[in-house]
Amino acid sequence: MNQTLLSSFGTAFERVEHALDALREGRGVMVLDDEDRENEGDMIFAAETMTVEQMALTIRHGSGIVCLCLTEDRRKQLDLPMMVENNTSAYGTGFTVTIEAAEGVTTGVSAADRVTTVRAAIADGAKPSDLNRPGHVFPLRAQPGGVLTRGGHTEATIDLVTLAGFKPAGVLCELTNDDGTMARAPECIKFAQQHNMAIVTIEDLVAYRREHERKAS
């Protein structure tokens, strides 16, 4: 990642801390990966605190594929099969079958309905029958170990919301430009500033976690 673009947002560690503060305050975070990976920015929110207004913003400015990042334990609890047995996507993104709340939704596609689905999936004691399949929310299974195992937006989301003190569940969606193309770092940074989001890179988070684990050992 071009550090010149990020220098005004502090050091890598400061950017992670700002991201955690943003989540604790109920705000979103823009998570950037490297130019030689997906080269995109994802809007992420803690699943516990995401509002209908934030979901609407995500749908309006994102790819439309709103994803709910979950741990393997939660995936098993909800009995969500993986979308395919043999994942041949470039980065092995862990899509499960799509979901919809079994109660409290209409078509399932509105911002309010998608928030209802997210809340149903992360509720304490949630069970498979609380969700219908397919639906308009795309669960993603994070790899154990987070970004230290796989440097993806899914793992970054789980790591960030967990470090911020929330349940290990977060919502993400890729930012797109008005013409439908994928937003790159300059556009992502501008959008984040306009919408009071913190900005962090996956590289920042990897360094942060490694340093904290080194100090803990």
UniProtKB/Swiss-Prot annotation:
Pfam families: DHBP_synthase (PF00926)
Cofactor note text: Binds 2 divalent metal cations per subunit. Magnesium or manganese.
GO BP term, example: riboflavin biosynthetic process
Metabolic or biological pathway, per its Swiss-Prot or TrEMBL entry: Cofactor biosynthesis; riboflavin biosynthesis; 2-hydroxy-3-oxobutyl phosphate from D-ribulose 5-phosphate: step 1/1
Gene Ontology CC annotations of this record: cytosol
Site (Essential for catalytic activity): 136, 174
SUPFAM superfamilies: YrdC/RibB
A GO molecular-function annotation: magnesium ion binding
Cofactor(s) named in the record: Mg(2+); Mn(2+)
Binding annotation for D-ribulose 5-phosphate: 37-38, 42, 150-154, 174
Chain positions recorded as Mg(2+) 1 binding sites: 38
Top class in the EC scheme: lyase
Lineage: superkingdom: Bacteria
InterPro entries cross-referenced by the UniProt entry: DHBP_synth_RibB-like_a/b_dom (IPR017945), DHBP_synthase_RibB (IPR000422)
Reaction(s) catalysed (UniProt annotation): D-ribulose 5-phosphate = (2S)-2-hydroxy-3-oxobutyl phosphate + formate + H(+)
Keywords in alphabetical order: Lyase, Magnesium, Manganese, Metal-binding, Riboflavin biosynthesis
Protein's UniProt keywords contain Nucleus: no
EC number annotated for this UniProt entry: 4.1.99.12
Residues annotated as binding Mg(2+) 2: 38, 153
Subunit structure: Homodimer.
Family: Belongs to the DHBP synthase family.
UniProt function note: Catalyzes the conversion of D-ribulose 5-phosphate to formate and 3,4-dihydroxy-2-butanone 4-phosphate.
Name assigned to this protein: 3,4-dihydroxy-2-butanone 4-phosphate synthase
